[in-house]
């Protein structure tokens, strides 16, 4: 287990912070590690149709991502606000990005995004019993919402059309562990 000896903040921004931690490693050596501190996030797989149907419809986003060099397919997601629960965040992001509201929000799992340099965790959910509405994206979000059958979404993962890690994990977790596909 690593033990933190000291932390030095080198950057603090709107979304994240960067620290240089001096840590004692399991072998008792002392290391300096750059750590991206993130408040955490939630992501949600919205099922437009009954999850028990043979091929449920999934709402996907085609969202412009500067870091990815353009638009990519993903599930709705966003950063936890201070004091906000992961489920509340998932519900908020679902409504903001798709316009939908969920009667049911079920927890799937929690993942570390890149534990080699960040403490970011994303809490994954599946939403069902949706009522649709108009998306209300933030001013820096450029996205389109599309419904696709889950079979097509899984094919998009196989064909590398969906390359966003949180979305792949959430969709495959849902298909494999919740729906038994």
Q: At which residue positions do the language-model features occur?
A:
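Short, well-ordered beta-strand micro-motif
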Residues: 20-22, 46, 126-128, 147-149
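Acidic, metal-coordinating catalytic segment for phosphate/diphosphate chemistry
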Residues: 7-45
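Active-site-adjacent beta-strand/loop module that shapes the phosphate/pyrophosphate-binding cleft
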Residues: 22-27, 111-133
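Nudix hydrolase/Nudix homology domain
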Residues: 2, 6-7, 71, 82, ...
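Conserved Nudix-box catalytic region and its N-terminal flanking loop in Nudix hydrolases
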Residues: 33-39, 45, 53-92, 96, ...
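Short helix-loop capping/hinge motifs at secondary-structure junctions, enriched
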Residues: 30, 51-53, 131-133, 180-181
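A short coil-to-beta-strand element that immediately follows conserved catalytic motifs
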Residues: 3, 101-108
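Short beta-strand micro-motifs in enzyme catalytic cores
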Residues: 17-21, 57, 71, 121-123
